[in-house]
Structure formats: structure tokens, C-alpha cells
């Protein structure tokens, strides 16, 4: 079978466009991409709530702020507070009185687990945007 040169050009251009489109920064769940690279010493008195497992704090950063949760002595989770349900509304989630659930009852009406940001109450279909974390025993780094 003989393929005409213009068809080969179209195939090549299509492949190039798909490759380039695949290289742009990802916006998970429609939450705006915000560069995050934060480091702090968890032993600082300002972060006393992070010194034991199940502790959490709010910090500035990300799209609508960040929740930092200590799962174990060596493992942390950092999640954006921007609700992924109708992200254009800019709803911000809060840790509720149970200390287990993150929710926004006024704006997005969704609920998430504090341990991993997964959805526990609709209408959100995707969990909270998570950031990478590394911990060396004293300094926690949160980044994307």
C-alpha cells in the first residue's frame, strides 16, 4: 500500500501536537496549579501540633492554603484546601470538629478524609490535591 506524502505530514503533525500537549503542567481536578516548595522545622514551637501523629496545621501556600497532617512519626500528608468540586468557585475546606474529616458545608458541600484527602461526602468526585512531602527527622519539605 502506498501512502501519499501529505498523509505522512498530517500523521507527523498530529503526533507532534499530541506530544506537545502532553508536556504542559497538569491541573488536577481543575484546581489551579500553584508552585509549592515550602520547608520548615517541625520542632519549631509554631508547629507544635505536628509533633505527634494525627496532628495537623494550616499553612499558607498552594491555591487556597495547605493542610499538613502527620500520619506517623515519619510520614506526612500535605493537601490543598481548594475544594475540587466546582473549583472555579474557590471554596476552601476546613478540618471539622471530628479532627478526621475535612469539609466545606457552605460553598462546595463536600467532605474528605484528613489522612489522604479522599472523598467521603459528595458532590466532589475527586479528592483534595496532594503535594509531595519529604522528611529528614526535623525538616519537612512540601513541594510539587
Positions of predicted regions on the chain:
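Acidic, glycine-rich flexible loop segments
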Residues: 120-121
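Short cysteine clusters
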Residues: 83, 104-107
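N-terminal pre-ligand scaffold of iron-sulfur
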Residues: 25-99, 112-116, 127-144
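Short, flexible active-site loop motifs that bind/organize anionic cofactors or intermediates
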Residues: 13, 37-40, 107
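Sec-dependent bacterial lipoprotein signal peptides
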Residues: 1-23
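Charge-rich, low-complexity amphipathic helices
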Residues: 1, 23, 72-73, 105
